[in-house]
């Protein structure tokens, strides 16, 4: 693993990030396949193709939905918004942690936030079908924020102010908008921050 403090090598900005790239490609391919089969804005169609729905997960034990729901998106704008953010910040975290640790953070935040969201919906007696990579992406943001703070507020082209501003705006937008899974965002952020603190090792 390379060092990513103030003395990081500038050519690190241009290194390949294969895991992040693969995640984006998988999301795009899944969306293309679902778009070919039907309407990705149709709730019933998306439920039938792996979206999250707490009665199916908790009562029917369809636990695979905790993972599959993180790779499906409701419409092209939902996909593009998530993938643009992931393309911008995911490679930074992959270079800082390495491929395996990055994948652990991404999947753990995605699955963990889906689980928390399902339990929260059950407790509130809400019956919404949901999906998307935003819980995992908030995990990436949380992990990055911890790492940036440990690197004196800067990591490559990111700083702590940018990340806190993004997270704050996204959560505010979610609270003020309908149809946003805020619990997935918040829990994904917390999971990512915890794992980022545990997995990151800064070379001296």
Regions found by a protein language model. Give the residues of each.
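A detector for small-residue-rich transmembrane helices and their helix-helix packing motifs
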Residues: 2-204
């Amino acid at each position: 693993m390379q060092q990513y403090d103030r003395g990081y090598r500038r050519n690190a900005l241009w290194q390949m990030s294969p895991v992040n790239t693969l995640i984006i490609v998988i999301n795009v391919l899944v969306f293309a396949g679902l778009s070919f089969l039907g309407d990705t804005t149709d709730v019933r169609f998306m439920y039938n193709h792996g979206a999250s729905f707490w009665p199916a997960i908790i009562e029917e034990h369809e636990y695979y939905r905790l993972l599959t729901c993180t790779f499906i998106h409701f419409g092209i704008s939902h996909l593009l918004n998530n993938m643009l953010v992931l393309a911008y910040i995911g490679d930074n975290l992959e270079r800082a942690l390495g491929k395996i640790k990055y994948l652990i953070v991404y999947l753990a935040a995605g699955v963990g936030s889906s689980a928390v969201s399902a339990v929260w919906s059950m407790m509130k007696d809400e019956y919404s079908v949901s999906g998307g990579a935003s819980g995992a992406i908030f995990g990436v943001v949380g992990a990055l924020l911890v790492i940036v703070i440990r690197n004196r507020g800067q990591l490559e082209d990111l700083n702590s102010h940018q990340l806190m501003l993004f997270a704050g705006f996204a959560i505010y937008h979610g609270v003020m908008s309908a149809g946003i899974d805020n619990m997935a965002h918040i829990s994904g952020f917390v999971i990512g921050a915890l794992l980022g603190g545990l997995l990151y090792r800064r070379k001296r």
